[in-house]
Curated annotation (Swiss-Prot):
Pfam families to which the protein is assigned, alphabetical: ATP-synt_A (PF00119)
Encoding gene (name): atpB
Subunit structure: F-type ATPases have 2 components, CF(1) - the catalytic core - and CF(0) - the membrane proton channel. CF(1) has five subunits: alpha(3), beta(3), gamma(1), delta(1), epsilon(1). CF(0) has three main subunits: a(1), b(2) and c(9-12). The alpha and beta chains form an alternating ring which encloses part of the gamma chain. CF(1) is attached to CF(0) by a central stalk formed by the gamma and epsilon chains, while a peripheral stalk is formed by the delta and b chains.
GO process terms (BP): proton motive force-driven plasma membrane ATP synthesis
Lipid bilayer topology: Multi-pass membrane protein
Protein family per UniProt: Belongs to the ATPase A chain family.
InterPro entries for the chain: ATP_syn_F0_a_bact/chloroplast, ATP_synth_F0_asu, ATP_synth_F0_asu_AS, F0_ATP_A_sf
Location of the protein in the cell: Cell inner membrane
Keyword entries, A-Z: ATP synthesis, Cell inner membrane, Cell membrane, CF(0), Hydrogen ion transport, Ion transport, Membrane, Transmembrane, Transmembrane helix, Transport
UniProt name for this protein: ATP synthase subunit a
Transmembrane segments annotated in the record for this chain: 17-37, 79-99, 105-125, 134-154, 176-196, 199-219
Length: 226
């Protein structure tokens, strides 16, 4: 990213400042959008309220399909929707010249993945109890428990790697792709690339949200006979 101009470099050229500058900018944009959507609530939604309600209803529908219940979907809606908003705006801001995607840094993606990892284990223990929750890690066959338990531990730890590196790799790749396109064919020619990158920003936010719901469902939904 050395050859790419960033507005943040006008204040401080360091990578650390750029990272926190864009994180703060994403948070500010999210707050402004939320305020615009809730500023004058109406029975028949219009404008930003309509967009906000459509987004939340979409996330809630995803949660119902994943969790298997309206109650579970609504319980975790604030977390999942907030993660989706942060990931989406962090992705999309990088396609604007002069700005950089915070999700192109492993610092943010790993932090978000750890939040999901810690929270779904916390919810699983709270829903099932400490002993019963970790008993699931040993599998239904007691003789195989010494083998299954470490495999399950590695499997859960790999979710942190999967969540963080998938998002980081895709957005970092998108940034590099855009930089190459702009260098080779500037002006009007990169417009199709912008459409593709906008779609990818939506897609990565969607994947992060649905995986969060999947992990929460796996931790909190008690299976019969297991």
């Amino acid at each position: 990213m050395k050859d790419l101009f960033l507005f943040s470099s006008l204040l401080d050229a360091s990578h650390t400042f750029s990272y926190f500058f864009h994180i703060g900018l994403v948070a500010l944009i999210a707050v402004i959008v939320a305020m615009m959507a809730t500023r004058s609530m109406q029975l028949v939604p219009r404008g930003m309220q309509n967009l906000g309600e459509a987004f939340l209803e979409g996330v809630l529908s995803m949660g119902r399909d994943t969790m298997g219940s309206e109650k579970g979907a609504r319980k975790y809606l604030p977390l999942v929707a907030t993660l989706g908003i942060i990931v989406f705006f962090s992705n999309i801001i990088g396609i604007i010249p002069g700005f950089h995607s915070p999700t192109a840094s492993l610092n943010l993606t790993l932090s978000l993945a750890i939040i999901v990892f810690v929270y779904y284990h916390f919810e699983g223990i709270r829903a099932q109890g400490f002993v019963k929750y970790f008993a699931h890690f040993m599998g239904p066959i007691k003789l195989l428990a010494p083998l299954m338990f470490p495999i399950e531990i590695v499997s859960h730890l790999s979710r942190v790697v999967s969540l963080s590196f998938r998002l980081f790799g895709n957005i970092k790749g998108d940034d590099l792709f855009l930089m190459v396109i702009l260098a080779l064919v500037p002006y009007i020619a990169p417009l199709p690339a912008y459409v593709l990158l906008t779609f990818m920003a939506f897609l990565q936010a969607f994947i992060f949200m649905i995986l969060t719901y999947v992990y929460l469902a796996g931790a909190t939904v008690v299976e019969e006979g297991h």
